[in-house]
Amino acid sequence: METSFFYIQKTSSKRNAPLILLLHGYGSNEEDLFSFSRLLPKDATIISLRAPLSLFPNSYAWYNIYYDGSVKNYDIEGAQKIRDKLIDELDYFIEKYNCDSKRISIIGFSQGAILGHGIVQCSNSKIKNLVALSGYVEKDLLCMKKNSCSIYISHGINDEVIPYNESIETNKILDDNNIDYVFESFDQGHGVNQENLKSFLDWLYKKY
C-alpha cells in the first residue's frame, strides 16, 4: 500500500507510537503547521500532508472554493472525495511508521479543520483527538457515525476569512447531535496566536 499524498514527517523511535496528522489551510502547504512540530509530544510520529490541488507555487487546497457573485461556494463532491481518501489512507501511515491505531490525532487549520470534522464524523472512531483551528462543521461532509473522539475547537473573534459565527453554528450542530467538545475563542484574526497555541497544546498533551 502506498499513499498518493506528498508529506513531511517527524518520526518516533518508539514502536506503537501515537500518530499526529497535520492538515493545513486553503492556500498554504505542509510546512505551515509543521512549523510547531517541535512543540508536539516527543514520542509521537507527526505527518504533515500537502493538499493535492495546486493553486500557485507553494500554495495548495484540499478542494476548490469559488464565488457566485458575493456568495462563497465549494466543490462538495471534491471535498467528500478527499475526506474519504484521507480516511482510507490512514492505515498506510499506521503501518509504515508502526503507529498505534487507537491513538490518532488530527490538527487542522481552516480548510484542514473543516476536513478534520468530516473525517472524525465519518471514520468509525478511528480518530482519538481533533484540534480544529479557525474552521467549522460543513454539514455535507458529515456522516454522524458514532465515535468517541475528543474535540477541541478554537476561533478568533476577529476572523475575517471564516467568520467567528461559523464556530457558533458548529457548536449548535455538535450540541444537537450530543457530541462533546471544548470551545475557546481568542482575540485574533484568522490565525493562531500564542495564547491559542498554548491552549490547544495543553489540551492535546492531556488527551493524546
Describe each region flagged by the PLM.
Residues 106-108, 133, 154:
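Short beta-strand immediately N-terminal to the catalytic nucleophile in serine-hydrolase-like folds
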Residues 108-112, 116:
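Gly/Ala-rich beta-loop-alpha elbow adjacent to hydrolase catalytic centers
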Residues 152-155, 159:
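Short beta-strand/loop motif that positions the catalytic acidic residue
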